[in-house]
Structures are given as structure tokens and as C-alpha cells.
Amino acid sequence: MSRKYEYAQKLYDEGDFKRANRLYEQIAPQFVGKPQGERVMFFFANSYFEIGDYNVAGYQFERFLKSYPRSDKAAEAAFLGAKSYYMLSPKYSLDQTDTDKALTKLQLFINAYPESEYTVEANAMARELTTKKEQKAFEIAKQFVKLGEYFVLDYNLSGIAALDNFVNDYPGSVYREEALFQKFRAASNLAINSTFRKRKERLDEAVEAYNNLMKDYPETEFAKDAEKLLEDIQEELNKYTELENLAK
């Protein structure tokens, strides 16, 4: 057993993580409770990380932390465990379950080890994953607005609700400016295509959406498109007033 342990360590030190992993898998159970057990268990977990088997790496680092919570390697293990789940996070358009798990693990690490040498990297990874989640939520909301051009009522209402939720959930998002513009766009399309009974209220809501955009982003890159939409809204408001006067 001692020879296998030494050879596994040699392979690990040489960067042959795949062969080292196979040996650690054989010997790890025999080292439970022994002085070398902590070292074996850490390198066993990290060998999975190094060969790109991040699911198992995350699990093994969790086992290590449960077995050796006071280890000198605890912070590194917690970071690498969180990073394992970070590596599993897919592109924004796919299911973000692994992204959610990675964010949870990263936040737990940051809270537990705020002064760790790995905290800066952990914060950067957390920001990246948060941006990915923001992008997914924003693209879904934007898709509603696009569909609202063809199916006015339901999709514009859904788009407005989704964009409101997005702005509330991610107030500091890099997509916030466009989200406010897209809300104005959806509100305008909904208002212009509304029944006479609901048109005035929705036209006013569209103007409010425009004002919110310009209040927060007076130099918005969407100014030209927003002003064109506002002209359409003002024209519809004038028509509404004329029709209302005729009806008196």
C-alpha cells in the first residue's frame, strides 16, 4: 500500500493526474482515519478536477470538507469545490441549474473565507455567473417583446411583466438600459393596438416607460428609436383626445 501511495504521489507531482486518480481511487478507502488520509483525500478530489471530471470533483471536495473541516486545505478545497460547479455552468441559453448551484457554492466560500487568497477569483466567477443568469432572463423577456409584434396582447403583457421583474431582480445589470427601452417598446406596441376603452391608460403607461428610460439614461444609445416611438404615442394621444371630444 505504501508503494502505491508513493507512486500515486509521484504521478500527481508529475502532472499525470489520470493515472494518479486511478491509484488514489484504489488506495483512498484504506487511508480513512490514518495520518495520510487527509492528504490522499485532497489529492484524490483534486485529481478529478485536473482531469476535468467536475461533477465528481465537486462531490469529492464536499466529502473532504465534511471529513476534515479544520484542515489547512479547507479553504482551497471549498474554493475548488465551488470552481468545479462553476466549470459545469453551461452557456446562458441552456438550463441554469448548475449555474445556480455554482453561485450558491461560491457565495458560501466567500462568506466562510473572506480573506482567502482565492476570494478575488471567486468574486470574479460569481459576477460572471450572475451576468450569465441576467442574460438568460433578459433574452427571454426580449423574446416576449419580439413576439408581441405579431401577437400583440399576451406577449406584450408578458414582456412588460418579465422586464419589470428583470429590472427589480437585477438592478445593477449591464442590460438594464436596454431592458427599460424594451419595456417602452412593448408598452408602446400594446397601447397603440389596444381597444379604445384601454388605449388612454396604456398610452400614458407607455409615456411613463419612456420617462423612466430617459430619467435614468438621458444619453441612452436607444434615444433615436425611443423618440420615434414617443412621436407615435403622442400622435395616438392626440387622436384619442379628438375622438373623445367628438363623442361628447
What are these regions (language model features)?
Residues 1-248:
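Acidic, polar-rich low-complexity tracts and alpha-helical solenoid repeat scaffolds
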